[in-house]
C-alpha cells in the first residue's frame, strides 16, 4: 500500500512476470476458532523474486501486509471477506489470511435481505 493508503497495483509487465507461478499457488484447508476462519496460502518460493520490491517490508525483508487488491493482483484467488494479517516469518512464502467466522452466511443474508 502506498503512503496515501491506496493499494499499489501491479503494472502489466509486473503481472506478466508472475503468470508462470499462479498455477503453483497452494491453498490450505480452512480452520477456525470461535471468532475467525483461517487459511494459509503458500506461494512458490521462486515467485517471491518476481514480486516488486515495494510489496516487501524493508525492515523484515518479508512481504508486507497486502490489501485485497494487491494480493489478488499476485494471482491469489479466494472468496470474499479474507484479509491478509501476517506473513509466516520463518517461511516468508506462506501468507496468513483470516475472515470473520460465518462471513459468507452473514454476507449472503445482507445481500438477500
Swiss-Prot record:
GO terms for molecular function: cyclin-dependent protein serine/threonine kinase activator activity; histone binding; protein kinase binding; protein-containing complex binding; ubiquitin binding; zinc ion binding. SUPFAM superfamilies: Cell cycle regulatory proteins. GO terms for biological process: cell division; regulation of mitotic cell cycle; signaling. Signal peptide: none annotated. Pfam families: CKS. It comes from the Eukaryota. One of its GO terms (cellular component) is cyclin-dependent protein kinase holoenzyme complex. Keywords: Cell cycle, Cell division. Belongs to the CKS family. Binds to the catalytic subunit of the cyclin dependent kinase (cdc2) and is essential for its biological function. Homodimer (in presence of zinc). This is Cyclin-dependent kinases regulatory subunit. It comes from Schizosaccharomyces pombe (strain 972 / ATCC 24843).
Amino acid at each position: 500500500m502506498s503512503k496515501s493508503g491506496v493499494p499499489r497495483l501491479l503494472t502489466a509487465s509486473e503481472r506478466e512476470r508472475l503468470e508462470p507461478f499462479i498455477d503453483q499457488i497452494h491453498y490450505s484447508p480452512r480452520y477456525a476458532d470461535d471468532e475467525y476462519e483461517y487459511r494459509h496460502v503458500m506461494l512458490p518460493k521462486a515467485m517471491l523474486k518476481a514480486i516488486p520490491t515495494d510489496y516487501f517490508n524493508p525492515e523484515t525483508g518479508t512481504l508486507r501486509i497486502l490489501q485485497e487488491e494487491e494480493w489478488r493482483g499476485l494471482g491469489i484467488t479466494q472468496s470474499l471477506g479474507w484479509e491478509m494479517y501476517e506473513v509466516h516469518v520463518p517461511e516468508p512464502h506462506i501468507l496468513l489470511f483470516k475472515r470473520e467466522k460465518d462471513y459468507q452466511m452473514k454476507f449472503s443474508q445482507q445481500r438477500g435481505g
